[in-house]
Each structure stands twice: as structure tokens, then as C-alpha cells.
């Protein structure tokens, strides 16, 4: 045990160019995420940290481990938590949420309250975006003096991120982006300095694991709102188009798709119309 502990503190050898390409290909094949040569040090550090925990001394041995059947699948899931970016915040890119509020008011005026509203946060990370969507929907109810059912689905590939989203507990720093009135209405102190989303809002949000490469098999359909912000930047351009085409198919007629500004500038879909607002990159489905 002592020898292993001493070994775990020793630095791993740098990745060779061949090893980097092998890991780069595995990550892209399984998740679609592209790790550029400029981010080799990030990949090496992420792998190295996990390898030290396991006492694995070289990249080839660890590669065999994560590709070894069911046991490899479990280890791959643990590794993904290190490799996927989980930094996000509430109401990230405010203009998108301003658009959402306007859209929901118009949507309700058009279809009425009998139709349940379905919202989807793709790449929801630790939950800040789906809870932001839920807050906007809840506030729209209050503003319009109406009551209707709405539900928010958050999906992500990282199990640890989803666990955080389901826990719905956040540090005070996370709430800096939330208006004081909303923070008071939708969060309650935990007693340890952190804050938890109130049950009445949390019960509107459901989080599930989903690899965006498997959107063709996703059960979501007839969505009124889909947010896919700050996710597409990690994929090749052809893959971005493929993902967006799949998401467009999941929209209800009149539904809203919001993506990150600058993430896809040359994409068009025959069933969608761009939203005329230069602050956002969004589309509505015809019909």
C-alpha cells in the first residue's frame, strides 16, 4: 500500500502524439466532443488524475480499461465527469431568457392554458439552465394571472452533473446572477450557507442522462421550447448541423429553439424561421 501511495504522487509521462490521437478519437467517437491539439494538456491532466486514483501507470493500460465491456462502461462514465465542462450559471445569456418570457406570453395567448408547455434544456449540466427556464415560466404565470401546467426536462451526458441538478443546492455565488426577488421566491437556505430550489419549482424539472449523439432515440417530442446553449462549440460543424436538425424535429409547431450566439452561423432548416432579434440566435417552427 505504501509503495502504491508513493507511486500515485509521481508525475505521469507526457502523452505521445499517437496516444493523444487514440484518446482524441475515442472521445469524439463516443460523445462527439472534439479535443483540439491546444487542449492536449487538459486531456492529459484529466486522464492523469483518474489514473492516479486507480493506480494505472500508463495511458494504454487505462485505454484498455475504459473500453473493456461493462466494467469499462462504468469507468468511462466516471472519466466523462472529468472531461465534460460543467461550468454554467443561472440565466446565462440574459437576452435568451428575455426572448423566452416574450415567447411564452405570446404562446399562451395563441394556444391557451389547456395545452401543457414542455421545455427542454439540452446539456443542462448541474441544473442552472433548466431551473432558470422554470423560473421564467413560473413568473409568466404570475404576470399573466393564469395557471397552466409546464414541465422542464434537463438532459446531460454527465451523471455527476445530473446528480447535482437533481439535488438543486447551490452556493451563494451561484445566486449572484439571480434577481433578488426571484432568489427569495424560488430558493430557501439550507443552513450551511447554501441554497436549495424550493420544492414547488423543483418538481417541475426532471433530469435525465442523454448523449446528444443518440438524439434519434430520444423520447422527447412536441417540445414548445428547446434551449441548447454553449454545447455545440465542442462539436465539428457537420455534427452541429446534425444535432440541430434532430432538435428541430422535436419541436412542436410554433415551438422555439434557442442556441448559443455564434455557435452556428450558416445553418438553415426548411421547417424553421429565424427570430428577428440580433441579440439572440433562435428559431421558431412553422405551422
Located regions from the model:
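Conserved beta-strand signature within the Rossmann-like core of class I S-adenosyl-L-methionine
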Residues: 254-261
Amino acid at each position: 500500500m505504501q509503495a502504491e501511495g508513493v507511486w500515485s504522487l509521481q508525475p505521469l509521462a507526457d502523452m505521445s502524439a499517437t496516444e493523444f490521437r487514440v484518446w482524441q478519437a475515442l472521445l469524439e467517437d463516443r460523445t462527439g466532443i472534439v479535443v483540439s491539439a491546444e487542449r492536449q494538456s487538459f486531456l492529459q491532466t484529466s486522464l492523469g488524475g483518474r489514473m492516479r486514483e486507480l493506480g494505472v501507470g500508463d495511458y494504454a493500460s487505462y485505454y484498455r480499461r475504459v473500453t473493456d465491456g461493462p466494467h469499462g462502461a462504468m469507468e468511462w462514465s466516471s472519466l466523462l465527469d472529468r472531461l465534460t465542462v460543467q461550468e454554467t450559471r443561472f440565466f446565462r445569456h440574459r437576452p435568451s431568457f428575455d426572448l423566452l418570457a416574450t415567447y411564452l406570453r405570446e404562446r399562451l395567448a395563441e394556444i391557451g392554458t389547456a395545452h401543457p408547455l414542455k421545455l427542454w434544456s439540452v446539456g443542462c449540466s448541474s441544473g442552472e439552465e433548466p431551473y432558470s427556464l422554470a423560473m421564467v415560466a413560473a413568473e409568466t404565470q404570475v404576470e399573466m394571472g393564469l395557471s397552466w401546467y409546464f414541465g422542464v426536462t434537463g438532459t446531460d451526458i454527465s451523471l455527476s452533473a445530473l446528480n447535482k441538478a437533481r439535488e438543486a443546492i447551490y452556493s451563494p455565488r451561484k445566486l449572484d446572477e439571480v434577481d433578488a426577488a426571484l432568489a427569495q421566491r424560488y430558493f430557501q437556505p439550507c443552513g450551511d450557507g447554501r441554497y436549495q430550489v424550493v420544492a414547488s419549482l423543483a418538481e417541475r424539472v426532471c433530469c435525465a442522462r442523454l448523449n446528444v449523439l443518440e438524439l434519434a432515440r430520444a423520447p422527447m417530442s412536441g417540445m414548445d421550447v428547446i434551449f441548447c446553449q454553449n454545447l455545440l462549440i465542442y462539436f465539428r460543424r457537420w455534427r452541429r448541423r446534425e444535432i440541430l436538425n434532430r432538435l428541430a424535429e422535436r419541436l412542436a409547431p410554433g415551438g422555439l429553439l434557442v442556441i448559443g450566439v455564434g455557435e452556428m452561423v450558416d445553418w438553415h432548416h426548411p421547417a424553421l424561421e429565424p427570430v428577428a432579434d440580433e441579440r439572440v440566435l433562435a428559431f421558431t417552427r412553422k405551422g
